């Protein structure tokens, strides 16, 4: 029997969301994504501790931030040995509201990859989908540095990223699901509120439809999944980035997977363009309590994990 994972690959490019690159060969993803939290998780494992220790040792006199950048590149280059496509490497979330420093950091990451023999076409620079992050992506894209816009929870963020010419966006599913489930509390009914009605699934479907309807070339990569049903409900999305745990569940399943998203259907939809000048962007994002709260929370969490990583580095000196 064909596995659910193999069926999904007929409609969608499968991406592995992990810093644990030893698991990649098993699932044969096209691309891989990382973030500070995933790298922090990986370096706490015995298998990856030597990478951290060597990076600290090789750059003993440098700042923790300098070492983190080299650590990200060390993981990225190892990942690229195991996949045919691209790896996403994230700009420090503490720069999420600083356009120029985000641009500088994106350029620096690409230079480090190129110095390691990796072409920029194999790297996506991850930036938070703040107004400032989107403006940074606009500049980097013009320089041939491709960007992956993360912490994306709303259509207005997606529309602004597309207008800026971002290579790819990563709209989150699971974190949207979490927010609405918490809001409903005891009234949440998984049978009624999950599946195709899952708010996170609906958000990605809405963004995908908007992009295909208006002919944007920016790729849509659904991210942050809690269940395999969230994944299979988005079969047909350009890409889906999936944790090793959920990749394993899809690999072990033979449940039928049908295409759910289609560019042809999207082109026939009746839609209006979203206003994405700065004041309209900020107002629409502010008007969406879920997106506002989850964007802020995501930046805080990624920033906190960057600080934890810095402390680990300092402890090894």
UniProtKB/Swiss-Prot annotation:
Enzymatic class: transferase
InterPro entries associated with the record: Aldolase_TIM (IPR013785), TAL/FSA (IPR001585), Transaldolase_1 (IPR004730), Transaldolase_AS (IPR018225)
Gene: tal
Record family assignment: Belongs to the transaldolase family. Type 1 subfamily.
Catalysed transformations (reactions): D-sedoheptulose 7-phosphate + D-glyceraldehyde 3-phosphate = D-erythrose 4-phosphate + beta-D-fructose 6-phosphate
GO-annotated cellular components: cytoplasm
Pfam families: TAL_FSA (PF00923)
Entry annotated with the keyword Cytoplasm: yes
Task of the protein: Transaldolase is important for the balance of metabolites in the pentose-phosphate pathway.
Catalytic residues (positions): 126 (schiff-base intermediate with substrate)
Subcellular location(s) of the protein: Cytoplasm
Keyword terms: Cytoplasm, Pentose shunt, Schiff base, Transferase
HAMAP family, alphabetized: Transaldolase_1 (MF_00492)
Record field: transmembrane: none
Listed name of the protein: Transaldolase
Main location: cytoplasm
Taxonomic lineage of the native organism: Bacteria, Pseudomonadati, Pseudomonadota, Betaproteobacteria, Burkholderiales
Gene3D superfamilies: Aldolase class I
Quaternary structure annotation from Swiss-Prot or TrEMBL: Homodimer.
Superkingdom in the source lineage: Bacteria
GO molecular function, one term: transaldolase activity
């Amino acid at each position: 029997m064909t596995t659910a994972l193999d069926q999904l690959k007929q409609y969608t490019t499968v991406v592995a969301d992990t810093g644990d690159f030893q698991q990649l060969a098993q699932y044969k993803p096209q691309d891989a994504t990382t973030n500070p939290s995933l790298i922090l998780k990986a370096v706490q494992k015995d298998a990856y501790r030597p990478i951290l220790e060597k990076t600290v040792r090789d750059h003993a006199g440098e700042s923790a931030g300098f070492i983190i950048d080299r650590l990200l590149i060390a993981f990225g280059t190892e990942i690229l040995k195991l996949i045919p496509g691209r790896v996403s490497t994230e700009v420090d979330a503490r720069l999420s509201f600083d356009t120029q420093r985000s641009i500088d950091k994106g350029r620096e990451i690409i230079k480090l990859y190129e110095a390691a023999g990796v072409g920029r076409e194999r790297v996506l620079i991850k930036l938070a989908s703040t107004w400032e992050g989107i403006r940074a992506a606009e500049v980097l894209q013009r320089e041939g540095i491709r960007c992956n816009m993360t912490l994306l929870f709303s259509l207005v963020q997606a529309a602004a990223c597309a207008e800026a010419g971002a290579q790819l966006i990563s709209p989150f599913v699971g974190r949207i699901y979490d927010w609405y489930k918490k809001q409903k509390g005891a009234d949440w009914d998984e049978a009624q509120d999950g599946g195709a009605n899952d708010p996170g699934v609906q958000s990605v479907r809405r963004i995908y439809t908007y992009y295909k309807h208006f002919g944007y070339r920016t790729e849509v990569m659904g991210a942050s999944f809690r269940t395999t049903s969230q994944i299979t409900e988005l079969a047909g999305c350009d890409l889906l980035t999936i944790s090793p745990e959920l990749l394993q569940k899809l690999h072990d399943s033979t449940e039928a997977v049908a295409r759910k998203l289609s560019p042809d259907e999207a082109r026939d939809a009746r839609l209006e363009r979203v206003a994405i000048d700065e004041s309209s962007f900020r107002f629409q994002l502010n008007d969406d309590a879920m997106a506002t709260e989850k964007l802020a929370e995501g930046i805080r969490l990624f920033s906190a994990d960057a600080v934890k990583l810095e402390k680990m580095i300092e402890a090894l000196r």
